[in-house]
Regions:
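Residues forming the flavin
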Residues: 1-225
Length: 225
């Protein structure tokens, strides 16, 4: 988006390691079912290269310089310490489900080891352990916009069935078609999840890392609580 707006970033720092990439290769064949997402990703990387954005893969020890405001970012790349001057730094360490609403009504949650996040416990229809409550989209898990829409349709079918508006046969037939679409949409996820796992630095931040910017709470504050 920045590149297309005419203000491309000066660099892209990725914490992905060589071992992450090698592990992801076992999922390549399955990911080909979602080839459009792979083509889209390669196209975006090509767009960044054409714009002159330097891509640094395998960086570690990332930290932001500055006191009152950001002045740059420090990191290690290929064993050497480096620093880039910048007053606008965008951080991203993966996407996690939005669980606030589900937690507020007492929905049970489980730990997702692959994505390192908690997600609501739901059945194949999206229904949770709170009667009549269905959870789909980014509140249930990470699968992308198209997968979220399909999950929404599956949940809607179940609601119609429970309300007596459609028969069990119609429910099964229509759900079967939607589940086939969902498998196709989700085919690329194992590859992406293993190729781009959350960085260890993000999972185990040092004490000075600001965890909550609003309240200026650091990782050390939380550990000492």
């Amino acid at each position: 988006q920045l590149t297309r707006a005419g203000t491309p970033p000066i660099a892209l720092l990725e914490t992905q390691t060589r071992s992450d990439f090698l592990v992801s290769l076992r999922h390549v064949v399955g990911a080909l079912r979602g080839w459009r997402y792979l083509v889209k990703g390669l196209s975006m990387l090509s767009e960044l290269r054409r714009a002159g954005v330097k891509r640094n893969v395998g960086v570690t020890d990332v930290s932001i310089s500055g006191v009152e405001f950001a002045t740059g970012v420090r990191f290690k790349y290929r064993g050497r310490s480096r620093e880039l001057n910048s007053d606008a730094i965008l951080l991203h360490h993966g996407v996690v489900p939005n669980t606030q609403i589900a937690r507020s009504i007492g929905v049970s949650h489980k730990w997702n080891e692959q994505g390192h996040y908690f997600s609501a416990v739901i059945d194949v229809w999206g229904e949770c352990d709170q009667a009549g409550v269905f959870i789909v989209g980014d509140s249930a898990g990470i699968g992308g916009a198209q997968a979220a829409a399909v999950n929404g349709r599956i949940a809607a079918l179940r609601v119609l069935y429970k309300a007596g508006r459609i028969s069990e046969n119609i429910l099964a037939d229509k759900a079967s078609v939607l589940r086939a679409q969902l498998r196709k949409e989700m085919a690329v996820r194992p590859f992406l999840d293993s190729a781009y796992p959350p960085a260890l630095q993000a999972l185990m931040p040092i004490d000075s890392t600001v965890v909550c910017r609003c309240e200026e709470v650091t990782a050390g504050d939380i550990r000492g609580y």
